[in-house]
Amino acid sequence: MRIYQAAHHDTRVRDYLFTRRLIWAENTVNAGLLVGNREFQAQITSANPVTEILTGGSLLLDFGIEFHGAVRFVTGSAAGKIRLRFGESVSEAMGCPDQDHAIHDAELVLPRMGMLEYGNTAFRFVRIDALDRNVQLINVHGVALYRDQKVTGAFHSSDERLNRIWDTAIYTVRMNMQDFLYDGAKRDRLVFMGDLHPEAKAVFCAFDDVSIVPDSMDFIVSHSADTADMNWIRSYPF
């Protein structure tokens, strides 16, 4: 039963993804405890050890697959300011990610014995730096947002590479199926009529519910003047 009747209902679901690998750590204690950790809730006292990033320390986590969503921190009794970087690759997360269309590099203040969720982008890796004091982490996990739609299309051949291409294509377009059908889950996170053409073909081939396609087209039309080209690109209206 929906409680907020006047609200816009989010058609997406959310899954928590656990850390698959600890790629790099510096000035940390028990960093490996984050791998496969299934803790969700902060607590006042716990007999279990926690991960601690010492002041100036950092670590790099791998969630094992790229996804669209956020990262969620569950913190212990020591918390402070961190620098958080998202990356589709290790080199991006270890560098200075751009801020195009979503924040990929931010300074955040973590609460004591609490939870903080941050991000709205596509990523696989996160780097976390403790800036001003030691930080205790009970857990760090990814929050994947996606439309839980049945895949009704299928492709199979004797060439395993072609089979993987099909699987990757379906997964990629599913990441783009958010509030509307984005041109890209990381960037530009916008609805472009030109990008809708190949994406719509993939949606029609793969999923049972294709309502996101007309919804996205209606969105573009409603934001285009009668005398202007869609997305300001001359070839898009044709």
Model regions and ranges:
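Extracellular/oxidizing-compartment recognition motifs
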Residues: 1-183, 194-195, 208-220, 226-235
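Conserved short loop/turn motifs at secondary-structure junctions
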Residues: 186-190
